[in-house]
Each structure stands twice: as structure tokens, then as C-alpha cells.
Design a protein with these regions (language model features):
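Membrane-interfacial, low-structure loops and terminal tails that flank and connect transmembrane helices
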Residues: 1-11, 95-108, 164-170
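Interfacial helix-loop-helix junctions of multi-pass membrane proteins
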Residues: 60-76, 122-146
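Hydrophobic cores of alpha-helical transmembrane segments in multi-pass inner/ER membrane proteins
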Residues: 21, 83-90, 145-161
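Extracytosolic (periplasmic/ER-lumenal) interhelical loops and adjacent juxtamembrane/interface segments
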Residues: 36-74
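N-terminal signal-anchor transmembrane alpha helix
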Residues: 12-42
Length: 170
């Protein structure tokens, strides 16, 4: 008699990752609108979203004004990272990690490329803080997007791969 070992179904893992990604992308934009709704539970949800944004974004005061007087919860640099993660998720759904642009298949070289792309965010922020250029939403979104591509092109295939189900005989 053969038994299957318990493993999470692929749909569970990818569905959970998709729910988290949707929350991360929609939360910063939704929070300013939710802040204008005084009815329970919207103020609580808004406070949670803003609290999370202040914890992850190094410059939340540079966020876009979406619904005056409320800003998005993260700056466009951080939001660029999230947009790139959404793009890589959609690309993965199209080719299931088989395209030449997926960095995990290049092992060390792919990890090196992902690392270089990931450092675009902090390098741009340091250059801005040193005064080489002023904060510009187009620039910071681009550098955030590059960082998100580095993260996404390397990790999305790992997060969304289908686990191998092994059978064991008793």
C-alpha cells in the first residue's frame, strides 16, 4: 500500500503568496481612501496599513499624495519594488520559469545578477542622500523597479514552483 507524505498543495502556497502580493500592492494605495471612512473597521485597517508602511519604507514622507491630506503609505521607490514583483509574478504565470530571463537557472551567475539589481535601491538612495540629485518620483520608481526585478526574477520561480510529491511504500 502506498501513502503520500503530507505536503502543501501547490495551489495553497501560490495562493497564499498571491494574496500577500495583492495586499502589499493594494494596501499603500487603498489606505488614503480608507482613512476617509469613519466607520468600523476601516480606521483600524488604515492604522495597520500605515503602521506597516512606516516600518518598511525608509522615506514614507516622500510618498505620493493620493487623497489629500493622506499620502500613500510607502514612497515610490518601495512601490516600484512591488510593481516589479507583480510583473515577475505575471511573467512566471506565462512561462512557468522556463524563459531565459529567470535568474535561478543560472545558479551563481543568476544570484550575482540578482544581487547587483537588488543593490540599485540602496545605491540610488545613498546618491540622493549625498545630494547628487534631488528626490524625483520617476528616478526612485525606476530604481525600485530594478531592485524588484532582481528579487522577483530570482525568487518568484522558487516561491511558485510545484513541490514534488513522493510516494512511500509501507
Amino acid at each position: 500500500m502506498a501513502r503520500l507524505s503530507w505536503q502543501p498543495l501547490p495551489i495553497q502556497r501560490s495562493a497564499m503568496a498571491d494574496v500577500i502580493l495583492v495586499a502589499l500592492v493594494s494596501g499603500p494605495v487603498a489606505a488614503p481612501f480608507l482613512a476617509h471612512i469613519p466607520f468600523f473597521p476601516f480606521p483600524i485597517i488604515t492604522n495597520i496599513i500605515y503602521w506597516m508602511g512606516r516600518r518598511v519604507c525608509p522615506q514614507p514622507d516622500m510618498a505620493l499624495m493620493v487623497m489629500p491630506p493622506n499620502l500613500m503609505t510607502v514612497c515610490m521607490r518601495c512601490y516600484g519594488v512591488l510593481l516589479a514583483l507583480v510583473l515577475t509574478r505575471l511573467l512566471f504565470e506565462r512561462d512557468r520559469g522556463k524563459g531565459a530571463y529567470w535568474l535561478h537557472q543560472y545558479r551563481f551567475l543568476g544570484a550575482a545578477i540578482a544581487t547587483v539589481l537588488t543593490f540599485a535601491y540602496p545605491i540610488e538612495m545613498i546618491i540622493e542622500l549625498l545630494g547628487w540629485w534631488e528626490y524625483n518620483n520617476y528616478i526612485v520608481t525606476t530604481f525600485g523597479f530594478l531592485t524588484g526585478l532582481g528579487i522577483g526574477l530570482f525568487l518568484v520561480p522558487v516561491l511558485y514552483r510545484k513541490p514534488n510529491l513522493k510516494t512511500y511504500s509501507v
